[in-house]
Amino acid sequence: MADRSMPVPDGLAGMRVDTGLARLLGLSRTAAAALAEEGAVELNGVPAGKSDRLVSGALLQVRLPEAPAPLQNTPIDIEGMTILYSDDDIVAVDKPAAVAAHASVGWTGPTVLGGLAAAGYRITTSGVHERQGIVHRLDVGTSGVMVVAISERAYTVLKRAFKYRTVDKRYHALVQGHPDPSSGTIDAPIGRHRGHEWKFAITKNGRHSLTHYDTLEAFVAASLLDVHLETGRTHQIRVHFAALHHPCCGDLVYGADPKLAKRLGLDRQWLHARSLAFAHPADGRRVEIVSPYPADLQHALKILRGEG
């Protein structure tokens, strides 16, 4: 904790503690009120409540929490993460499951940027330090192709391409049951789940979300789909197909059958970023990068095909 002490200025006399503290330290009123409620604010050595009034000349003492350590993408060799394509502007990786795109609060596992750093890639684009080069992301539990910008030119061009939806993003998803129709479009807005802030759901006031799909192969208990995302919302494929009562196999968060997941040997959702196609940021030529299925997804398909 860091201590701050100061006399109350005349101009703040009579003001509520949370309001005056917010003005003095540049905090939000909510943050200032929280400090008072935690007993971290004193006036002349006496704990002050958030609604107490400031007195001119009184000694205001505040215990501030230490600033969190900056997020770091720790360089580490990542088993199974291979380079699918690389040049002076971009690098495309085959991201394994259980790997995050970049460092974030609460995540202590490996990251794509950490793996690239360990492999000798130097990324110095603009943007927040722990997200340098990141132009799109994949869920931790989703495997497949992910492109990272190395040059500032690529970062600018690809950020714009993803924003304006000129990147062709194809996923393969193994879902429970058989969607009807076998090919179609899901147009349903996605927002935060009301009961679980770490989940998403179809919500009336959610963000516009559009998913196109075609059935590639039908099994007794599941269907393999080719999915084309027109938008790119967090958990979009998982939420859309769960809403149709066809969750991704293995996706227990969104209602998948745990018995089927166990039978298929899945400990994560069967969802794979199969390909990305876009105009190269340097010369505009079309680049298409394809990722093969990892072993766990191949194993699940082998079991299903054996049951046919």
Swiss-Prot record:
Q: Which SMART domains match?
A: S4
Which GO terms fall under molecular function for this chain's record?
pseudouridine synthase activity; RNA binding; rRNA pseudouridine synthase activity
| Pfam families tied to this protein | PseudoU_synth_2 (PF00849)
List the CDD domains: PseudoU_synth_RluA_like (cd02869)
What InterPro entries is this protein classified in?
A: PsdUridine_synth_cat_dom_sf (IPR020103), PsdUridine_synth_RluA-like_CS (IPR006224), PsdUridine_synth_RluC/D (IPR006225), PsdUridine_synth_RsuA/RluA (IPR006145), RluA_PseudoU_synthase (IPR050188), S4_RNA-bd (IPR002942), S4_RNA-bd_sf (IPR036986)
Q: Which UniProt keywords apply?
A: Isomerase, RNA-binding
Q: What is the designated name of this protein?
A: Uncharacterized RNA pseudouridine synthase Rv1540
Might you give the EC number(s) for this enzyme?
5.4.99.-
UniProt xrefs under Gene3D superfamilies: Pseudouridine synthase, RNA-binding S4 domain
* PROSITE patterns for this protein: PSI_RLU (PS01129), S4 (PS50889)
Is Metal-binding set as a keyword in this record? no
Show the stretches that span the lipid bilayer.
none
